């Protein structure tokens, strides 16, 4: 019998839950602040009268304005798609830390480029800067969840990867409110719209500085044959000595997982590509990871993020500032609910139940909002006042946000950071992040045209996709809460899917008890001089 993985409820020293692990996760999550801010500020910036006047939107036909706006928004997602794959070789050869530094540097360059745009130079610098910024956030969206999941103890892995999602929402909150602030306090001018673009430099600058002081992922160091440095980093992160039994168990599990990979996939740069192309189990899991992001974007959330003025106008709100204020409230709701998700839900309710409940609740709300728009046709309400039905529709819109945010907003990122064995994780996360940006690109590119052509049908479209996601999650997605990264193969191979979590955890508890019994029988004693090796218990 050999060492298997760690289980969520094994005896865990209190030292493991320390400030260092949260600080590392928080610094890495400045990546998501960049993403959140960029996703939120651009839609309301394009709606500012000063921006539209300087770039002559006011002289264009509505269809042309929709097309240019969609291009400005979507070139960022196009860059992010390629950035997600660009991060794979950096993360593989140079590590997670250098990957984060590279992402921050590229994003900062792109954000700086955008500041050179004006009416005389045209939109070229904004297009180019947003492509570069997209490459940076695409790379960051690949590396950050991997980095955090590789540092985290199983029992708080969802918690820590959730810090990434929290950073996204904090960045989004600032992005949603900043244009309301400049529109209320500054006269229409170049300065009014350039300030939101300049604020992009704050999270990227903080990441650029903070990443210098990050500790490299111990799991990446083990896979790169830098064992002593890996043990040193792991001991620093866990605040435990190398000869502590908790450390011996964890390092033994990592050693065993790497040995299994050597004998199956292999540890080289191209090995995961070969495995992805020839191993049906890996292909299937890549498909599931991509589908999680398909259904996430199928919720309609990014249509709201990027085109909130258009969305609120369809419900009946009038006035640029009113739409921006409502967008800001949307950001507040998302951020508050994300705190609840992070602190109470993700590692208590688990991933699977959150997805199921969130999809059901969000779908009902979207059906109601769509039905109101179909019946009342608020877009033709010329007096600009909200009716009782409109207020109810706004309530269900915000209720949709309450259902969506703690379920589909961050959970796909958490699950994709968990689903793959260590040597597949970089490539798998690259594919997952790229798929997110691909679906994101399609939504951002065609949302204006969808609202123009489909009207209330857009709400029914997204509501229908949410219903379909319930079936997919129930039959295909297992619960990953508390399952060690090294045991994901066993989880996905266990049937039926809806019982796999309990079956695998029971087996892990049994193996953990046997391992500790073998340790005691081997005469292990805690000694600072004992050389740390992968422990091999006696055969049963």
Curated annotation (Swiss-Prot):
PROSITE patterns: MFS, SUGAR_TRANSPORT_1, SUGAR_TRANSPORT_2. InterPro entries: MFS_dom (IPR020846), MFS_sugar_transport-like (IPR005828), MFS_Sugar_Transporters (IPR050360), MFS_trans_sf (IPR036259), Sugar/inositol_transpt (IPR003663), Sugar_transporter_CS (IPR005829). The keyword Chaperone does not apply. It comes from the Eukaryota. GO terms for molecular function: carbohydrate:proton symporter activity. It is found in: Cell membrane. Integral membrane transporter that imports quinic acid to be catabolized as a carbon source. This is Probable quinate permease. It comes from Aspergillus clavatus (strain ATCC 1007 / CBS 513.65 / DSM 816 / NCTC 3887 / NRRL 1 / QM 1276 / 107). The gene is qutD.
């Amino acid at each position: 019998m050999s060492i298997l993985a760690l289980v969520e409820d094994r005896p865990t020293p209190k030292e493991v839950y320390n400030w260092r692990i949260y600080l590392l996760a928080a610094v890495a999550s400045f990546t998501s602040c960049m993403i959140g801010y960029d996703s939120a500020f651009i839609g309301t910036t394009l709606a500012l009268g000063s921006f539209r006047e300087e770039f002559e939107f006011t002289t264009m036909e509505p269809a042309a304005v929709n097309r240019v706006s969609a291009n400005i928004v979507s070139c960022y997602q196009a860059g992010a798609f390629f950035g997600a794959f660009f991060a794979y070789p950096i993360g593989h050869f140079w590590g997670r830390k250098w990957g984060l530094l590279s992402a921050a540097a590229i994003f900062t360059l792109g954000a700086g480029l955008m500041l050179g745009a004006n009416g005389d130079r045209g939109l070229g610098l904004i297009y180019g800067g947003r492509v570069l910024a997209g490459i940076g956030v695409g790379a960051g969206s690949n590396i950050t969840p991997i980095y955090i999941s590789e540092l985290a103890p199983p029992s708080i892995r969802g918690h820590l990867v959730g810090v990434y999602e929290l950073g996204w929402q904090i960045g989004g909150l600032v992005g949603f409110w900043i244009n309301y602030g400049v529109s209320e306090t500054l006269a229409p001018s170049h300065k009014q719209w350039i300030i939101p673009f300049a604020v992009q430099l704050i999270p990227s600058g903080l990441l650029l500085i903070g990443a210098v002081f990050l500790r490299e992922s111990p799991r990446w160091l083990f896979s790169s044959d830098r064992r002593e440095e890996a043990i040193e980093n792991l001991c620093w992160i866990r605040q435990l000595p190398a000869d502590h039994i908790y450390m011996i168990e964890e390092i033994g599990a990592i050693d065993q997982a790497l040995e299994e990979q050597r004998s199956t996939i292999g540890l080289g740069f191209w090995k995961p590509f070969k495995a992805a192309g020839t191993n049906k189990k890996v292909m299937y899991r890549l498909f599931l990871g991509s589908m999680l992001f398909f259904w996430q974007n199928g919720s309609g959330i990014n249509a709201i993020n990027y085109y909130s003025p258009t969305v609120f106008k369809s419900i009946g709100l009038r006035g640029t500032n009113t739409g921006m204020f409502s967008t800001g409230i949307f950001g507040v709701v998302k951020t508050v609910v994300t705190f609840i998700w992070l602190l109470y839900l993700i590692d208590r309710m688990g991933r699977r139940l959150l997805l199921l409940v969130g999809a059901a609740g969000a779908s009902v709300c979207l059906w109601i909002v769509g039905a109101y728009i179909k019946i009342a046709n608020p877009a033709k309400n010329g007096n600009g006042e909200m009716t009782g039905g409109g207020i109810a529709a706004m309530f269900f819109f915000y209720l949709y946000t309450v259902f969506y945010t703690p379920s589909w907003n961050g959970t796909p990122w958490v699950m994709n950071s968990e689903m793959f064995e260590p040597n597949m994780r970089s490539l798998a996360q690259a594919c997952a992040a790229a798929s997110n940006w691909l679906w994101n690109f399609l939504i951002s590119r065609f949302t204006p045209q969808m609202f123009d052509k489909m009207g209330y049908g857009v709400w029914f479209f997204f509501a229908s996709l949410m219903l379909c996601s319930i079936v997919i999650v129930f039959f295909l997605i297992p619960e990953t809460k508390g399952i060690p990264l090294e045991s994901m193969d066993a989880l996905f191979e266990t049937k039926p899917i809806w019982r796999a979590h309990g079956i695998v955890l029971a087996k892990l508890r049994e193996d953990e008890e046997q391992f500790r019994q073998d340790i005691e029988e081997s005469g292990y004693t805690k000694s600072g001089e004992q050389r740390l090796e992968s422990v091999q218990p006696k055969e049963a």
